[in-house]
């Protein structure tokens, strides 16, 4: 496996892979890789001939008071995991490499997708995501790109972007990977104290209970979100940002009664750490 840092090197690697007729899988990450990322890289390795993992803590998706400087950076460990899972190249550019101009060119999905859920408190976040992913798509020219369902709102934005900008690739969205105790894998879990980690288990428990309500026939979104909110509020260390349901695709307002496919998403702070989780509620 090769570790590379420049756009020129990545272009060279991709040109060689294309010349050999290899299919390319891209796994965009911000590093601090865990089993969730490992599952994406393994899927990319299974479905493509040549796998690129990008490791880039993208400054444009962090707001002024967010954790850009504190975000974990573990490139050596990331490379070991990527290699073990079958990556051919790890692309770890500097911010200057990815944003060469003094002024920026933005790729932005408009409408509801970037405004609801996390978009209310992180107004520039999704613009940063769609811009950096566009750059990575242009550089790696993948046949398939891999993302986790945990970042469901990001996935909806990227699906819209791929469709609207005619990117010739398939977005592969892989299931949420959880710890044995149910907590969704996240690079930010490393910030949690032991007590906060235990408290955060209320997220997966409350989503599981909501899914059971839905499967038992409940179709009133307000009743489901109220039940989840009540569950989470029983945990004294929790500080809820949102508990909401939107229709899929596109995070449209939910119908009452609920029909089709719907996303139940939560964002909750434990101490200073904000965690997200979700479950899709749909007819079997």
Task: Give residue spans per PLM region.
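Phosphate/ribose-recognition catalytic cores of enzymes acting on nucleotide-derived substrates
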Residues: 227-284
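Nucleotidyltransferase catalytic core that binds NTPs
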Residues: 2-237, 246-250, 280
């Amino acid at each position: 496996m090769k570790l590379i840092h420049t756009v020129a090197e990545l272009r060279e690697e991709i040109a060689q892979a294309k010349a050999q007729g290899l299919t390319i899988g891209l796994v965009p990450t911000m590093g601090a890789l865990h089993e969730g990322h490992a599952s994406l890289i393994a899927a990319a390795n299974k479905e493509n001939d040549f796998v690129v993992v990008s490791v880039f803590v993208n400054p444009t998706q962090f707001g002024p008071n967010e954790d850009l400087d504190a975000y974990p950076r573990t490139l050596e460990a990331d490379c070991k995991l990527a290699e073990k899972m079958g990556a051919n190249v790890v692309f770890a550019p500097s911010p200057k490499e990815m944003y060469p101009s003094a002024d920026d060119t933005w790729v932005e999905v408009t409408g509801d997708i970037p405004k609801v859920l996390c978009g209310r408190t992180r107004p520039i976040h999704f613009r940063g995501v769609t811009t950096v992913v566009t750059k990575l798509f242009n550089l790696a020219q993948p046949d398939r790109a891999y993302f986790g369902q945990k970042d469901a709102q990001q996935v909806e934005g990227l699906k819209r972007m791929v469709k609207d900008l005619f990117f010739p690739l398939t977005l592969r969205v892989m299931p949420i990977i959880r710890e044995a105790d149910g907590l969704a894998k996240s690079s930010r879990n490393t910030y949690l104290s032991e007590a906060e980690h235990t408290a955060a288990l209320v997220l997966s428990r409350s989503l599981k209970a909501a899914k059971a309500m839905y499967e038992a026939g409940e179709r009133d979104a307000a009743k489901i979100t109220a039940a989840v909110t009540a569950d989470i509020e029983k945990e004294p260390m929790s500080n809820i940002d949102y508990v909401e349901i939107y229709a899929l695709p596109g995070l449209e307002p939910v119908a009452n009664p609920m029909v089709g496919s719907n996303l139940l998403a939560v964002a909750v702070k434990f101490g200073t750490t904000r965690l997200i989780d979700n479950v899709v509620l749909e007819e079997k």
